[in-house]
Amino acid sequence: MSAQRCKYGEYVTLTKNAFTKSGYTFLGWYTASSGGTKISSTTKITGTVTYYAQWSINSYTLTYNANGGNEVSPASKSVQYGSTYGTLPTPTRNSNAEFTYAFAGWYTAASGGTQVTANTTMGASNTTIYAHWTATRRSYTIGYQTTYGSLNRTSQSVAYGSKGSCTLTMPSNDAQYTYTFQGWYTAANGGGTKVGSSLTLDTPSVTGAATYYAYVTRAVNRYTFTFNANGGSTPSSSSITKSYNEAIGTLPTCSRAADNTYTYAFAGWFDTSATG
């Protein structure tokens, strides 16, 4: 500022302060650079003199933005200009079905920006800093079960949004049983929702833990016994049908009329043809 000219013995109003100092507030004019007496409108001019601007250091508000996390308490603090931020809080963020979150530090912007720490110096304005997060996609256990047959796996870990896979090998049919694949379901024994019709299941996109069930039915084979009278009279029941391992039960009888050479007595049922 330029010097101000005054007359001896006058009370003078000093020129408005034109000085600025970043991070400080002007306190007034003083007779010394530190300490001294504050000059007022009642100060009388008695000669050439130098007055000194004195300043007070400002404090500014540092505000914490959790940026999707749980808000911290207190949500801000006062930091003096030029001082370091000091201890900063560590926020948390709740997991969701897709991600877990780990705190990655405080930054000057919600996305990007520059990382700040306890040693960062406070500038000359109120400041907001933003929590950044590292997201980790969650994985879930997908289980597989079957009523009959074998599976290439019984469980696997699958990332959220991806699909699991499992292949069923059907059991072989044998004399006693016939096996039929009915599909993959969300509940045992064909319950819930059908999610697949082929032996290899590609699961729906994973959104949580789940178990899928291969539904294979097993039917006991049935066999028909046909009775051949082999020259005799046809019995009243020419055949019977029974399940595997089921007792045949009462068998029919038959007769054969005598001829000029022989008379015939029923000797039982055999699995090969016989004459005599």
Task: Please place each PLM-identified region on the residue numbering.
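Secondary-structure capping and domain/repeat boundary segments
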Residues: 1-276
